[in-house]
Design a protein with these regions (language model features):
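Conserved beta-strand-loop-beta-strand hairpin that lines the nucleotide-binding pocket
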Residues: 1-6, 51-125
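Conserved short strand/loop->alpha-helix "switch" segment adjacent to the catalytic nucleotide/phosphoryl-transfer site
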Residues: 21-45
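Two-component transmitter module helix at the DHp-CA junction of histidine kinases
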Residues: 3, 17, 24-28, 56
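STAS-typified acidic loop motif
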Residues: 6-18
Length: 125
């Protein structure tokens, strides 16, 4: 399998399951450490969930790219608004996504890319 995989999907909650399936297949084909799969799947789900909730446009593009033992998960959406971790109160039912990504990834970032941005996270694989 190539060292990268790309999928363009509807910007909808249902896309998360399809993209997790792509991640599982990619992990297996790239012979990644299966013990790292749950963390990578949660990071992917949070990135996709943020794009679904906060971005604009009908679609989003997800790219998985492996470099050695690092998997970059990148989500390109149509919103120019950059993500920012915030403190969620105990009662809040949302608002922890970027904190989860920060905890589970080696690093994460955001790059402007017209007409929106790419939010990415590097996880061990």
């Amino acid at each position: 399998m190539p060292s990268s995989s790309v999928a363009t999907v509807p910007r909808a909650p249902e896309s998360s399951a399809r993209l997790r399936s792509l991640l599982w297949t990619t992990f297996a084909c790239w012979d990644c450490d299966a013990e790292r799969l749950d963390d990578a799947a949660l990071v992917l789900s949070e990135l996709v969930g943020n794009a679904v909730r906060h971005a604009v446009g009908d679609t989003m593009q997800v790219r998985l790219r492996r470099d050695g033992h690092v998997l970059r998960i990148a989500v390109h959406d149509g919103s120019p608004v950059l993500p920012a971790p915030r403190e969620a109160s105990f009662e809040d039912e949302s608002g922890r996504g970027m904190l989860i990504i920060d905890m589970l990834s080696r690093r994460w970032g955001c790059d402007p890319l017209a007409p929106g941005k790419v939010v990415w996270a590097d996880v061990s694989c």
